[in-house]
Structures are given as structure tokens and as C-alpha cells.
């Protein structure tokens, strides 16, 4: 092969790499679920920022679906350019509606709920196996915490003792009535979608998660992890988000 041909080949490779880089979405917004706050995303945040992404973490009030959508929308309004929207657990219901925001180019569900239009969160569990280790204690005011004694096994069985204790003690209670609020329009009908499903999740039946992800047309990654997959398998979660960022603009529905 001549030097000129090698030079042209090198230029083509460089052009292809530059084109791929231009199509990679930089903005990522992370949305936590119930019984948690945004601090649990720290390991995913660190990995994504190291890959050059601009990451913003929503702090949901967990007072209603509408309030959580509003909190997420405020963050999306701040993004400059296309954005990958990521939700864990209840955060999946939030991104299903908030994902209709024009800035959102792709969705990533991390062991997350994905209701269809007109459905609420509570109905997603119908017909699937119960999760006896996921125990919610509901107060007189209608807000629920995860039970202190069963938290580790139900939410973070594969986390070390320190991380499990931190997650337990950093809980944010959710207004249980939020689970009865239906989604108006499921954004996954219109946006390319990815899903990470934790196969050892004691909070959700994996069959339920798979059903929702397949219905949404998601590209699914299975990983051996608890419901705290965002913390215990941060490498896998961040890589799926990065792949979504690379591909969302070229796989738009």
C-alpha cells in the first residue's frame, strides 16, 4: 500500500471518528427513584463525566408525579442541545412523561418502571410475582419509607454494609398516592430507548421489568445486581448510558 493510500485511509478514519464524536450526545440527566435521592448516582456521575459527558442530577421531591416531572423538566430546560434522560426505579415513570421534552433524544431505564400512556405505576405490578423483601412502611400522612430492617436485602443486597447503610439512612419518603397517577403520553413511543435490568433485584419481579422494557422497544442489558444497580454496577450502567449517547441521534424513532 502506497504512502498516499495509507494517508488517505488515515484521513478517512479520522473523519469517521470526528463524525462519530459529533453525533455523541454530551448532556445526560439522571433521575433517582423513590426512597432515595440523587446522591446515589455519584459513581455513575464520576464515570460519565470522565467520558466527557455533562451530567446533571435531578433532586425529586417525591411529593407527586407532577412535582417530580416538574423538577426534571426544570433541569431539562437548562440543557443546551440533545440530552439522554436516565431514570431508576420510580424515576422511570418520571422520565416516561418528562421524556417528551424536546431536548430529550433518548431514554435509559435502570431497573425502572415504564408505564404506557394512560397507565399508572401501581398497575405495572399486576400479574407479576410479589417481592416480600421490599417492605414499605406508610405513615399517617401517606408518605412511605422502606422498612429499616429489610432495606439491605430488599434494595441493596449486593452493596457493602457502608453503602447499604448510607442508602437506607438517606431515604426520601414518597407520597404513596403518586403511584396512582397515570402517565399522559409515554415518551418511549417516540424516543429510542435502552434498559438495564438487574437480575437479582428484590424490589421488582424481573419478568415485570423485562415485559415493560420489551414493550418499550428497549435495547436491554441484563446484569447481576440488586435494585441498587446504579451503585453496585456503575460501570455497566454508565456504559449503557454512553452507548445511548453515541447512538440516539442515529436511531431516532
Model-identified regions with their sequence ranges:
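Short, proline-enriched alpha-helix->beta-strand connector loops that line the catalytic pocket
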Residues: 26, 188-193, 215-218
Amino acid at each position: 500500500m502506497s504512502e498516499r493510500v495509507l494517508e488517505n485511509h488515515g484521513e478517512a478514519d479520522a473523519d469517521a471518528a470526528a463524525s462519530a464524536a459529533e453525533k455523541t450526545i454530551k448532556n445526560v440527566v439522571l433521575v433517582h427513584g423513590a426512597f432515595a435521592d440523587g446522591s446515589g448516582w455519584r459513581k455513575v456521575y464520576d464515570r460519565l463525566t470522565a467520558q466527557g459527558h455533562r451530567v446533571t442530577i435531578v433532586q425529586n421531591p417525591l411529593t407527586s408525579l407532577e412535582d417530580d416531572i416538574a423538577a426534571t423538566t426544570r433541569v431539562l430546560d437548562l440543557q443546551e442541545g440533545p440530552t439522554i434522560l436516565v431514570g431508576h426505579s420510580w424515576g422511570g415513570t418520571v422520565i416516561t412523561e418528562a421524556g417528551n421534552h424536546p431536548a430529550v433524544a433518548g431514554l435509559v431505564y435502570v431497573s425502572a418502571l415504564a408505564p404506557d400512556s394512560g397507565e399508572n405505576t401501581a398497575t405495572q405490578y399486576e400479574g407479576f410475582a410479589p417481592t416480600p423483601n421490599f417492605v414499605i412502611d406508610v405513615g399517617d400522612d401517606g408518605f412511605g419509607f422502606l422498612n429499616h430492617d429489610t432495606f439491605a436485602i430488599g434494595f441493596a443486597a449486593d452493596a457493602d454494609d457502608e453503602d447499604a447503610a448510607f442508602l437506607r439512612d438517606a431515604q426520601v419518603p414518597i407520597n404513596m398516592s403518586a403511584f396512582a397517577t397515570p402517565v399522559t403520553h409515554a415518551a418511549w413511543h417516540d424516543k429510542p430507548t435502552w434498559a438495564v435490568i438487574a437480575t437479582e433485584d428484590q424490589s421488582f419481579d424481573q419478568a415485570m421489568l423485562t415485559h415493560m422494557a420489551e414493550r418499550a422497544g428497549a435495547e436491554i442489558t441484563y446484569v447481576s445486581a440488586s435494585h441498587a444497580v446504579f451503585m453496585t454496577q456503575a460501570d455497566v450502567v454508565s456504559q449503557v448510558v454512553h452507548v445511548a449517547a453515541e447512538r440516539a441521534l442515529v436511531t431516532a424513532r
